[in-house]
UniProtKB/Swiss-Prot annotation:
It comes from the Eukaryota. Coiled coil: none annotated. This is FK506-binding protein-like. Disulfide bonds: none annotated. It comes from Rattus norvegicus. Keywords: Phosphoprotein, Repeat, TPR repeat.
Length: 347
């Protein structure tokens, strides 16, 4: 009976736990223009139902058409002159996000030592996000770790910026390599929250389930970028649990690989599949997706090996057959090109 590589399904995790913790931080982030969806990429539905937190993905640098004007006026607004738009960034006032997704230019330094954490309700003045981005404009309340605002194009970047700010801080957000600010934020106040390490294991798993559930909803709605963020946040929560960790990590890595393929990141997709296959060597969807990724990377031998493993277990699997056919054709084209090159060398 054919095992569908397309429709979400429940899975039993039978693999033995791995003793080493994998370093997947880089692999939890990816976002580029969305490509046409291919068969065999839909994520599995979680057996338990629901999942949440933080894959983000590193956002692609975009051209900002409408630069943000400086804030003026009373204490409820930014105190920035328009001349500041052209000033060179001073190294002493810069904060670089560790994942490289943005640079924060501090305009007014905040006070105190505390910063927003998971669950903190932040009173924020946000101005200048690109039109249609879905991000709030003006005074708003944003809760770290929850809310649909985090699923917007600039949501996760904004959340990471807020987590780096102190009360009263005003800052401009710059994308890497851009001197024009994407937006400006002022953190007026925030409530106490908790770091992820302060959460009990059951709390982390509950948050991860909600994030997973939301990620699958977004994927089915045609938003692999938003889905990847959700899956990445769920994985980051679960990776803080003692090894081997819950079996749901296998499904999350497989789902993340599906998103990464659609987003044009075959190298990251292959790495996500590796994490799955370390725990469950016979995971058909991971084998298929890694085969697709290897083909995209030009490693036709590895692609062929993975796809043949799928067909050995499920000979009627149409998606694997079609992909293997493409790989064979691609190999013949490469061989023909090599032969022409050799003839020219010895002619």
């Amino acid at each position: 009976m054919e095992t569908s590589l397309i429709s979400p399904m429940k899975e039993n995790n039978t693999a033995q736990p791995q003793q080493r913790e994998e370093n997947t931080q880089q692999n939890l982030n990816a976002a580029v223009p969305i490509k046409q969806q291919s068969p065999g990429l839909l994520p599995e539905a979680l057996e338990v139902g629901v999942k949440p937190d933080p894959a983000s993905q590193i956002l692609a640098t975009q051209e900002i058409e409408n630069p943000v004007a400086g804030f003026e006026g009373d204490s409820d607004k930014f105190h920035i002159s328009t001349d500041e738009m052209a000033e060179h960034l001073q190294a002493s006032d810069l904060w670089y996000c560790p994942d490289g997704s943005f640079v924060k230019k501090i305009i007014v330094h905040g006070h105190g030592l505390d910063k927003p954490k998971l669950g903190s309700k932040c009173r924020v003045l946000a101005l200048g996000f690109p039109f249609g981005s879905g991000m709030p404009e003006g005074w708003t309340e944003l809760t770290i770790g929850t809310g649909q605002w985090r699923e917007k194009t600039w949501g996760e970047l904004t959340e990471k910026c807020l987590e780096s700010m102190r009360q009263g801080e005003e800052a401009k957000i710059h994308l890497p390599g851009s001197s024009t600010p994407l937006a400006k934020l002022r953190l007026d106040s925030f409530t106490n929250g908790r770091d992820s390490w302060e959460l009990e294991a059951v709390e982390k798993e509950a948050l991860a389930k909600e994030e997973h559930r939301r990620g699958t909803e977004l994927f089915r709605a045609g938003n692999p970028q938003g889905a990847a963020r959700c899956y990445g946040r769920a994985l980051r929560l679960l990776l803080t649990l003692p090894p081997p960790g819950p079996p749901e990590r296998t499904i999350l890595h497989a789902n993340l690989a599906a998103c990464q393929l659609l987003l044009g990141h075959p190298q990251l997709a292959a790495q996500s599949c590796d994490r799955v296959l370390e725990r469950e060597p016979g995971h058909l969807k991971a084998l298929y997706r890694r085969g697709v990724a290897q083909a995209a990377l030009g490693d036709l031998d590895k692609a062929t090996a993975d796809l043949k493993k799928v067909l050995a277990v499920d000979p009627k699997n149409r998606a694997a057959k079609e992909e293997l056919g493409k790989v064979v054709i691609q190999g013949k084209i490469q061989d023909a090109g090599l032969a022409r090159g050799l003839r020219k060398m010895f002619s």
